[in-house]
Amino acid sequence: MNDIISKINPFSSIPKHQIAQQIVNFGLIVATALMIWKGLMIFSGSESPIVVVLSGSMIPAFFRGDLLYLNMEDGPFRVGEIVVFKIEGKEIPIVHRILQIHEKEDGLYDIRTKGDNNNVDDVGLYSPGQRWLSRDHIIGRAKGFLPSVGMVTIVMHDYPQLKFFLVFVLAVFVLSTRE
């Protein structure tokens, strides 16, 4: 009877202290990933140091699924520079190129952007009544990229069941691996 139970429930044969150790190991993996992310945030100066290009608006510079590394260094922005910005009321950041910079008398400046593959500037994407972006909208400058690496993120976003399935499989794998 015990043999049948151990085949049905593979965790029944594992000592409780080993299960606890596996749970701690899983927690350490999650904590390490969070620390790496926080470290990237501090090192890059950006709230989102890595983003995935979600549309084709920046073709030929970037394609859907490219993974961008961002940096938010001090210094003036330049026309032609690729930036990532967030619009109030929209949760997904946008990757586009600076089209115009309007310097104001107080030393601050306004920025207008456009996707390389778009026919018009981004004023239509901004909040109603907004004509320019300020520095506060910019979350980073594109400093490097890895082609197509972000497609995994896009597939998981498009098929959320796959994301939960993969997390479940990884959790079972980590918890059931014996050391």
Swiss-Prot record:
Subcellular localization(s) per the UniProt record: Endoplasmic reticulum membrane
Residue spans, topological domain Lumenal: 44-179
Transmembrane regions: 23-43
Disulphide bridges: none
Pfam entry (one): Peptidase_S24
Region of interest: C-terminal short (CTS) helix: 165-176
Residues at the active site: S57 (charge relay system), H96 (charge relay system), D122 (charge relay system)
Keywords annotated in UniProt: Endoplasmic reticulum, Hydrolase, Membrane, Protease, Signal-anchor, Transmembrane, Transmembrane helix
EC number: 3.4.21.89
Enzyme class: hydrolase
GO biological process per UniProt: signal peptide processing
UniProt cross-references to InterPro entries, sorted A to Z: LexA/Signal_pep-like_sf, Peptidase_S24_S26A/B/C, Peptidase_S26B
Record's subunit section: Component of the signal peptidase complex (SPC) composed of a catalytic subunit sec11 and three accessory subunits spcs1, spcs2 and spcs3. The complex induces a local thinning of the ER membrane which is used to measure the length of the signal peptide (SP) h-region of protein substrates. This ensures the selectivity of the complex towards h-regions shorter than 18-20 amino acids.
Family affiliation: Belongs to the peptidase S26B family.
Protein known as: Signal peptidase complex catalytic subunit sec11
Natural source organism: Dictyostelium discoideum
Gene: sec11
